[in-house]
């Protein structure tokens, strides 16, 4: 998943 979902 991309980092902006964290």
UniProtKB/Swiss-Prot annotation:
One of its GO terms (cellular component) is extracellular region. GO terms for biological process: defense response. Expressed by the skin glands. The modification Leucine amide is found at residue 6. It comes from the Eukaryota. Keywords: Amidation, Amphibian defense peptide, Secreted. It is found in: Secreted. Belongs to the frog skin active peptide (FSAP) family. Tryptophillin subfamily. This is Tryptophyllin-14. It comes from Pithecopus centralis (Mato Grosso leaf frog).
């Amino acid at each position: 998943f991309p980092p902006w979902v964290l």
